[in-house]
């Protein structure tokens, strides 16, 4: 691995660290830096992959350090991820609102992760996560709440916070928590969800749009929250939603953004960093591995955004220019890394040196 990539990334990690970079914390930052650079360059999430391109001359020593870092109780979100994502979160909130999307996905060996992302432009960015052992299935509602509470302090009033989620996240406790914290939400629910029609309690499926309209809106349908049946264009079946927004059309418009988290999972796995091929096991270790991959994702997508703004003569050195408008920033940056590494390196160096102003 180029020493310049390692050094510039380490300088970035040190400059943005919320803890003074000395002693054990500096040592942990150096190990993280090696794993992060390896993940970016090799696009792999295996233990061997994230330790194969570090500045260590002894690959066996690098592998042991990577294992220790992933297992360490000190390798936490507060110290090694939050300080580096806060600038992007603030940028996303610059227009007075932030959109959060929550969903689960299988990651690592025999583990499933509950992921909270935020929307920046047309892309979902990883924000926080909880990992547990087991195959994909619903998380307990308390875990949903634990994840939201973990990031609550990042969003100061009067920013508008909007939470989107599928049918797993329609629980009454989660909705009550959102209401008590002035968060708005649009959450999918089942057609069998019982709601109050005023004169009777009946399944939501009883509601139907007036002919010529795409949705029907039922006010105060359940514990003060509203219900929507949405038969949008391209929907083979109607979508049933719960929301505390007062306008049905607005709720449907926001809910469309929920599906962006699917592209995030795809980028972290098969179309990006191959997290699905990692054989790392154990909830704590997989959670730490996701931290490395999430940081690699953030840096790579930011470089991709920079590349999107470059003139054609720069882009044509590594990609067909006519393909760029529809290409994801992650893929664009990775193509640049694969075909013109020195060019990609120059953008990573620029990003690491100007991280604070990148979001201004």
Residues covered by each model-derived region:
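Short acidic/histidine-centered micro-motifs embedded in hydrophobic/aromatic stretches
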Residues: 53, 69, 267, 271
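Residue-level signal for short segments within beta-strands and strand-turn junctions
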Residues: 70, 118-120
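Short, charged amphipathic recognition helices of the HTH superfamily
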Residues: 42-52
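Active-site- or DNA-interface-adjacent structural scaffold in DNA-acting proteins
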Residues: 40, 54-56, 60-109, 165-166, ...
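Short amphipathic alpha-helical segments
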Residues: 33, 47-48, 63
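Single, function-defining residue in the core of a domain
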Residues: 1-44, 81-82, 93-98, 109, ...
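Short glycine-rich loop/turn motifs
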Residues: 110-116
């Amino acid at each position: 691995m180029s020493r310049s990539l390692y050094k510039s990334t380490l300088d970035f990690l040190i400059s943005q660290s919320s803890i003074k970079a000395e002693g054990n914390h500096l040592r942990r930052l150096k190990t993280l830096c090696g794993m992060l650079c390896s993940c970016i360059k090799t696009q792999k999430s295996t233990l061997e992959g994230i330790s194969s391109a570090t500045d260590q001359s002894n690959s066996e020593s690098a592998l042991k350090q990577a294992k220790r870092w992933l297992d360490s109780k000190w390798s936490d979100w507060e110290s090694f991820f939050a300080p580096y994502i806060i600038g992007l979160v603030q940028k996303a909130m610059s227009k007075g609102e932030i959109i959060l999307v929550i969903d689960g996905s299988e990651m690592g060996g025999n583990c499933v992760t509950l992921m909270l992302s935020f929307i920046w432009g047309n892309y979902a960015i990883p924000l926080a996560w909880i990992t547990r052992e087991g195959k994909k299935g619903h998380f307990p509602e308390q875990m949903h709440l634990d994840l939201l509470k973990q990031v609550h302090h990042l969003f100061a009033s009067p920013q508008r916070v909007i939470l989107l989620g599928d049918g797993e996240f329609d629980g009454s406790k989660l909705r009550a928590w959102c209401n008590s914290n002035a968060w708005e939400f649009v959450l999918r629910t089942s057609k069998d969800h019982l709601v109050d029609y005023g004169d009777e309690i009946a399944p939501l499926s009883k509601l139907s749009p007036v002919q010529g309209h795409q949705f029907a809106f039922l006010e105060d349908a359940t514990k003060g929250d509203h219900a929507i049946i949405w038969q949008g264009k391209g929907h083979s079946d109607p979508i049933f939603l719960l929301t505390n927004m007062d306008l049905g059309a607005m709720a449907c418009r926001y809910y469309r953004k929920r599906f962006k988290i699917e592209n995030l999972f795809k980028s972290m796995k098969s179309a990006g960093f191959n997290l699905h091929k990692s054989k790392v096991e154990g909830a704590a270790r997989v959670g730490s591995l996701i931290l490395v991959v999430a940081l690699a994702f953030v840096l790579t997508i930011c470089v991709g955004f920079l590349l999107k703004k470059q003139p054609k003569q720069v882009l044509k050195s590594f990609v067909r220019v006519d393909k760029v408008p529809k290409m994801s920033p992650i893929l664009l940056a990775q193509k640049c890394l694969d075909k013109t590494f020195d060019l990609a390196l120059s953008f990573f160096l620029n990003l690491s040196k100007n991280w604070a102003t990148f979001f201004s």
